[in-house]
Amino acid sequence: MGFIIFVAEYQQIKLNPMNITHDKITEIFYLADDFCKEFYAVLDKNSLGKNPKRKPMMSHSEIITIMIIFHYGSFRNFKHFYSYYVSFQLRSYFPKTVSYNRFVELMEKEVLALTMMLHTCCLGKDTGIAFVDSTPIRVCKNKRIKRNKVFKGLAAIGKSTMGWFHGFKLHLIINDKGEILNFVITPGNVDDRQPLKDKKFVEKIRHKLYADKGYIDKNLVELLFIDGIHLITGIRNNMKNTLMELQDKILLRKRSVIETVNDELKNMCQIEHSRHRSFSNFITNILSAIAAYCFFPKKPAIKYEIVKSDQLSLFI
């Protein structure tokens, strides 16, 4: 019976719909390896105390690569992915694999390196057009909120367009090419406009930033305008009509591209699930999923052509 289950799980991993090519594995590993060499060289040079003499069997770049491949391939069960897919099909890439329990411990130690790699090597560049939005990250079902102990004191009850939830919010800023420019994680009860008041969150943004009606705030518009950012939002039904450029009106309608990015992060990269057993595992899962999305060859994007015109349109 054990052999039959093994074959079934092995075939399930082998027939995964999101095929991972050898070139993509090599691309991810080379980027992670080059970064880890420089990062840990600086870290060891400036760290206090003695460095451990015994090094893990797997290198830092191998661990980060496996973490990213899991989300890139749209796998659902990490234990089966590591035990069967990595240990057998990718044996030539990772010849010195450790046990599953040991690998989970090593994953948590790579959070700092993965965070720095994500911000320095994986995020996109500003193109002058950016979109901002938030999406809920549920950690449990609503009927189990009082019984949840993993995120006690960390997660909070918030409300989105889909109703109430218990968990966190992922705030994203993307450009018109679908590339993630920056992100931040907050408790579920934090206002969507609050992260925009942090200059570190919007330091890569210039020119125009498009958002939905939930970001309407006169003081926020003035605050961002000082930093060279023009926040453009829709208007509510009880507000007066305003004049805006035709280009802004068209791009405001294209704001749904960031909803598509959120959908791919949740359904393809599995950024949201309720099987976390620690907060560090939750952070590791989100960072790995965002890094995997950055390696997608084709991202949601908008196509447009700018024609210079001084015409203004009435936004109705």
Predicted regions and their residues:
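Short alpha-helical elements
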Residues: M1-I316
